[in-house]
């Protein structure tokens, strides 16, 4: 999914986490970042940090060449780029020799969906890079990316502003919202307190039966035997009044809700 670097973030640390994440297992973990999204005011600082830490930001011609190798003719991911080194991907796409120390290929992108191959999931050392005019546009773009390439999966945000984190967490269609951590490692529970797992559910929005990090309890059926511990009159709190059945049901429901809430408080 996308990774948003907010203006309140430590930019150098955020970029380090993203590149460390993307290069872990050569980008093959499905929770790894697929794109970086920033506001225009952050573009200079983020681009500088990316270059300083080993990002190869592609020229327009390099962008065009590599874009032809991301997807196959049927629209699915080209397996030739999956888990390959920067040098191998560069050779495959005809980009020439990578810059010294290049760890990840970064391609500027302006759209999402058909015709924008960098907006797709890329299980390799390739990141899309979106620059948006303001935070509202960033949020719309992140939602758009998730709905296109991974609804219900994972969203990363780098920020010290708690309000921004909460706002994005409520709005994005993701089962995992990872804050100030490498997404590939945070998503599987290595750098967060999420359940350790390599199978990540996407919930109903992603067509999955679970939004959990899938563990043993998600894969077994449990039979439960329940013994009665009280009678209906005890729940009502006394003898049943002489009223119609509909009214009895309504009062019973209210009493049950009241008792449940009382236990939770």
Residue ranges and their predicted role:
Residues 1-113:
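ALDH superfamily catalytic-core signature
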């Amino acid at each position: 999914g996308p990774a948003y670097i907010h203006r309140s973030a430590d930019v150098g640390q955020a970029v380090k986490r993203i590149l460390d994440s993307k290069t872990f297992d050569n980008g093959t973990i499905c929770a790894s970042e697929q794109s970086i999204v920033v506001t225009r005011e952050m573009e200079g600082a983020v681009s500088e940090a990316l270059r300083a830490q080993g990002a190869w930001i592609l020229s327009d011609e390099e962008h065009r060449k590599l874009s032809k190798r991301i997807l196959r003719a049927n629209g699915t991911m080209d397996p030739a780029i999956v888990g390959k080194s920067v040098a191998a991907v560069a050779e495959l796409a005809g980009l020439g020799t990578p810059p010294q120390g290049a760890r990840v290929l970064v391609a500027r992108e302006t759209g999402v969906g058909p015709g924008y191959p960098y907006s797709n999931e890329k299980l390799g050392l390739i990141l899309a890079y979106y620059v948006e005019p303001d935070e509202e546009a960033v949020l719309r773009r992140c939602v758009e990316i998730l709905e296109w390439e991974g609804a219900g999966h994972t969203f990363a945000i780098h920020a010290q502003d708690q309000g921004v984190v909460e706002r994005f967490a409520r709005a994005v269609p993701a089962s995992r919202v990872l804050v100030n951590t490498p997404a590939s490692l945070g998503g599987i529970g290595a750098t967060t307190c999420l359940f350790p797992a390599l199978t990540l559910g996407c919930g109903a929005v992603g067509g999955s039966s679970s939004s959990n990090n899938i563990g043993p309890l998600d894969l077994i059926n449990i039979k439960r035997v329940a013994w009665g511990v009280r009678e209906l009159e005890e729940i009502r709190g006394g003898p049943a009044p002489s009223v119609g059945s509909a009214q009895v049901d309504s009062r019973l429901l209210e009493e049950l809700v009241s008792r449940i809430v009382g236990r939770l408080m």
